[in-house]
């Protein structure tokens, strides 16, 4: 008899993981703490509740979120099938009627003959068996302590204080230059030099920019922000503060002038391929529109493509590159898997992708079969590759974006044509992957009128 897989957490990732296990013929015990223990962000006890927006993002497959959704359709995702069935008009996005979407998702998962839904809070790491952790950004305190004990101190974060990330190909290389401070070691940073007038204009805009409101439960835990001040708060402390902090220019010689600039913003490489660049020291709580307006004032970033904007919010996530394999198994505990936002992906569709892989692999392990690794040419595979192979020292949650994919050679200069090529390669790879491993389509669901 096949042992049941434990899935802890009934959000988007957990619901998908449980369904994929059951679909493979493996029994599942799905534990969801609501309504026994309410969450500060949820409003119902339904599975897969959408806490923030009701949108899964762009539908077009020449956009990263849309490509990821199409890959998941071809892999047989239940969550995406239910979302498609209950879509509401939203321009080019997949938005859903939350009430009917969560109701149908809950009914389908709870009524599956191989899924036992338990309304219970799990406070300890199960001592044995195959377990999928899908507890999300609001993991309960007792279980978070258990994960911390399992993984080691320092490998579980409780707040996401992240700087913006830009696509390297969108930088103006006539203005930025590669160098390390005092030319020590290899030229590892892109540097954006500022004159005094440029710095003054930037400082004034940053100090007066509008911040996002923290949610009520984030106000209660604001102590987590103390060690990681937002860049706009530094600006408000005085005109010179940034020049002695993240914008200090010492040791950075501008090749255009032969001198140190008045101030300098540094960008650090975020991925192995050097296609993603992080604004060093720019953790921020500014509204997203304000971030683009202010940060595009930085010389060289006028046309920057932001693949992730800065955030400061409550978000429990693992240092996945240190802990997880590309199968989403823990290196040190291969019968334990993790998925969703807990692993450091960002966004609803990325959580579904993690749930799909963790559920599929948990089922295969239960059947004594080898777990799967998604092709890195796919958006789903590129996300998992990022969370399992990123730099542990600088790891921050990441949404789907084309800069995660391996470059196509020779490089296609036209941006739209390049995105089409990424899409075509990814969908061909996911189709081959599905055929190779016998992965069928999702259940046919009637579309709501």
From Swiss-Prot:
Binding site for FAD: 9-14
Domain of life, per lineage: Bacteria
Leading EC class: transferase
UniProt-listed Enzyme Commission number(s): 2.1.1.74
Annotated Gene3D superfamilies: FAD/NAD(P)-binding domain (3.50.50.60)
GO cellular component terms listed in the entry, alphabetical order: cytosol
Main location: cytoplasm
GO biological process, alphabetically ordered: tRNA methylation; tRNA wobble uridine modification
Reactions this protein catalyses: uridine(54) in tRNA + (6R)-5,10-methylene-5,6,7,8-tetrahydrofolate + NADH + H(+) = 5-methyluridine(54) in tRNA + (6S)-5,6,7,8-tetrahydrofolate + NAD(+); uridine(54) in tRNA + (6R)-5,10-methylene-5,6,7,8-tetrahydrofolate + NADPH + H(+) = 5-methyluridine(54) in tRNA + (6S)-5,6,7,8-tetrahydrofolate + NADP(+)
Assigned keywords, A-Z: Cytoplasm, FAD, Flavoprotein, Methyltransferase, NAD, NADP, Transferase, tRNA processing
Any GO molecular function: tRNA (uracil(54)-C5)-methyltransferase activity, 5,10-methylenetetrahydrofolate-dependent
Cofactor: FAD
Cell compartment(s), UniProt: Cytoplasm
Pfam families per record: GIDA (PF01134)
Family membership: Belongs to the MnmG family. TrmFO subfamily.
Function: Catalyzes the folate-dependent formation of 5-methyl-uridine at position 54 (M-5-U54) in all tRNAs.
Protein's recorded name: Methylenetetrahydrofolate--tRNA-(uracil-5-)-methyltransferase TrmFO
Gene source species: Gloeobacter violaceus (strain ATCC 29082 / PCC 7421)
């Amino acid at each position: 008899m096949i042992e049941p897989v434990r899935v802890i957490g009934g959000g988007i990732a957990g619901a998908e993981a449980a369904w994929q296990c059951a679909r493979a013929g493996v029994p599942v015990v799905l534990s969801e703490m609501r309504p026994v223990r309410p969450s500060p962000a949820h409003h119902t006890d339904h599975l897969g509740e959408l806490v923030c927006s009701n949108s899964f993002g762009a539908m077009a497959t020449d956009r990263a979120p849309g490509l990821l959704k199409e890959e998941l359709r071809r892999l047989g995702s239940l969550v995406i099938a239910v979302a498609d069935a209950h879509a509401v008009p939203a321009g080019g996005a997949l938005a859903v009627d939350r009430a009917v979407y969560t109701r149908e998702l809950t009914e389908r998962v709870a009524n599956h003959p191989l899924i036992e839904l338990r309304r219970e809070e799990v406070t300890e790491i199960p001592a044995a068996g195959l377990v999928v952790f899908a507890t999300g950004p609001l993991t309960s305190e007792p279980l978070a302590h258990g994960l911390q004990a399992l993984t080691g101190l320092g490998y579980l974060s409780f707040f996401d204080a992240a700087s913006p990330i830009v696509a390297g190909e969108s930088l103006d290389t006539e203005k930025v230059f590669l160098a390390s401070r005092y030319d020590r070691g290899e030229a590892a940073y892109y540097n954006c030099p500022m004159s005094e007038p440029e710095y003054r204009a930037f400082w004034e805009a940053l100090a007066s920019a509008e911040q996002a409101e923290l949610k009520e439960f984030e106000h209660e835990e604001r102590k987590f922000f103390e060690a990681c001040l937002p860049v706009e708060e530094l600006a408000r402390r005085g005109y010179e503060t940034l020049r002695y902090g993240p914008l200090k220019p010492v040791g950075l010689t501008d090749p255009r002038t032969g001198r140190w600039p008045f101030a300098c913003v540094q960008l650090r490489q975020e991925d192995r391929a050097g296609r993603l660049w992080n604004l060093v020291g720019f953790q921020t709580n500014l509204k997203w529109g304000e971030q683009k307006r202010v940060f595009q004032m930085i010389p060289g970033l006028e046309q920057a493509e932001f693949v992730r904007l800065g955030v400061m919010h409550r978000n429990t996530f693992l240092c996945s590159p240190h802990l997880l394999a590309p199968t989403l198994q823990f290196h040190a505990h291969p019968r334990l898997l993790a998925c969703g936002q807990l692993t450091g992906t960002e966004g609803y569709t990325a959580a579904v992708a993690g749930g799909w892989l963790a559920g599929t692999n948990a089922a295969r392990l239960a059947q004594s079969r080898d777990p799967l690794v998604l092709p890195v040419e796919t958006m789903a595979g590129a996300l998992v590759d990022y969370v399992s192979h990123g730099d542990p020292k600088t790891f921050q949650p990441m949404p789907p974006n084309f800069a995660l994919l391996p470059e196509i050679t020779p490089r296609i200069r036209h941006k739209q044509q390049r995105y089409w090529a990424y899409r075509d390669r990814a969908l061909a790879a996911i189709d081959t992957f599905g055929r190779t491993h016998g992965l069928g389509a999702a259940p046919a669901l009637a579309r709501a009128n």
